[in-house]
A protein has these predicted regions:
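Short, basic/hydrophobic alpha-helical segments
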Residues: 77-92
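Sec-exported extracytoplasmic/periplasmic mature domains
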Residues: 18-26
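Short, glycine/acidic-rich hinge or "gate" loops at secondary-structure transitions
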Residues: 26-44
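Beta-edge loop/turn motif
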Residues: 87, 93-102
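Sequence/fold signature of self-assembling virion shell proteins
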Residues: 4-8, 42-78, 103, 107-220
Length: 220
C-alpha cells in the first residue's frame, strides 16, 4: 500500500485515524453495547450499535464454556447441532468466529500430517482452514484478533475473553452501511489539511438473535 514508492498512507495522520476507526468498528462488532449509555463515544455509547455479544445475550443464547478445556471441536459440533435442531439455522449458513489463540488450541488437538519430498524447499506447519463438516453442509471456523479481553467495559463485554466463540447465521447477520467512510475538508493548518471522517453503519441480525450464540470463555 504505497503511493509512487514515496509514502505509505498508513503512516499519515489520516491513515492512522482510519486504522483506529476500523479497529474500533471491529471491536464493536463483537462487544458493542449501547444499553450502557456511557456517553463517551465508546462501543458502550448510546449511539453504538449492538454487537454479537449483546444480541446473543438479549436472546438468552449465552453458554458458559469455562469448564471446557479440551475436545473443542467435538464441543463446537455439539453446539452447532443443538442450534440446528432447535432453531432455523442450517449447517451451510453457520459460521464460528474465535480468537487466534483459540484457533491454535483447536489445531493443537489434531494430529498434523507433514509431507516432505525432494522438491520441498520449506516445511509448512499450521492450519489453513478448519471447518465442521456434515453431509448437510459445513461451518467454517474463522480466527480474528478482535475477540480478546478488553479492559474498561461494563456491559456484555466486561467478561470478554480469548476463549469466546461466536456462532451465527451468515445470511441473517449482516453489516449494513448507509454511507461509506468519507472525509470532509475543514481547512488548513500550515501545510496540513484538516479533515473530518464519517461513516454510517450498523449490524443487523434478521434472526432477532435466535441464530446467534456466544460460547463464553473456553479454558484455553
Amino acid at each position: 500500500m504505497t503511493t509512487l514508492e514515496y509514502m505509505d498512507p498508513r503512516e499519515t495522520t489520516l491513515g492512522q485515524g482510519a486504522i483506529a476507526h476500523n479497529k474500533f468498528k471491529a471491536k464493536q462488532f463483537y462487544y458493542g453495547d449501547p444499553s450502557v449509555a456511557a456517553g463517551d463515544q465508546s462501543i458502550e455509547d448510546g449511539d453504538a450499535y449492538e454487537g454479537l455479544a449483546k444480541i446473543s445475550n438479549d436472546a438468552g443464547n449465552d453458554v458458559d464454556k469455562s469448564g471446557v478445556s479440551s475436545g473443542f471441536l467435538e464441543d463446537l459440533l455439539d453446539e452447532l447441532t443443538d442450534a440446528v435442531v432447535n432453531t432455523g439455522l442450517t449447517f451451510d449458513r453457520a459460521r464460528f468466529m474465535c480468537s487466534q489463540q483459540f484457533y491454535n488450541a483447536i489445531y493443537d488437538e489434531q494430529t498434523p500430517v507433514i509431507r516432505i519430498d525432494g522438491y520441498d524447499a520449506d516445511v509448512e506447519y499450521g492450519p489453513q482452514g478448519i471447518r465442521l463438516s456434515t453431509e448437510f453442509g459445513s461451518a467454517p471456523i474463522t480466527p480474528t484478533p478482535n475477540i480478546q479481553a478488553y479492559g474498561g467495559l461494563s456491559g456484555v463485554g466486561s467478561d470478554a475473553d480469548l476463549g469466546d466463540v461466536f456462532l451465527f447465521d451468515e445470511l441473517a447477520v449482516q453489516f449494513r452501511q448507509l454511507a461509506p467512510m468519507s472525509t470532509v475538508p475543514l481547512g488548513r493548518t500550515g501545510l496540513a489539511d484538516r479533515v473530518s471522517m464519517f461513516e454510517y453503519y450498523t449490524l443487523v441480525d434478521r434472526s432477532q438473535g435466535n441464530h446467534t450464540f456466544r460460547l463464553k470463555g473456553y479454558d484455553i
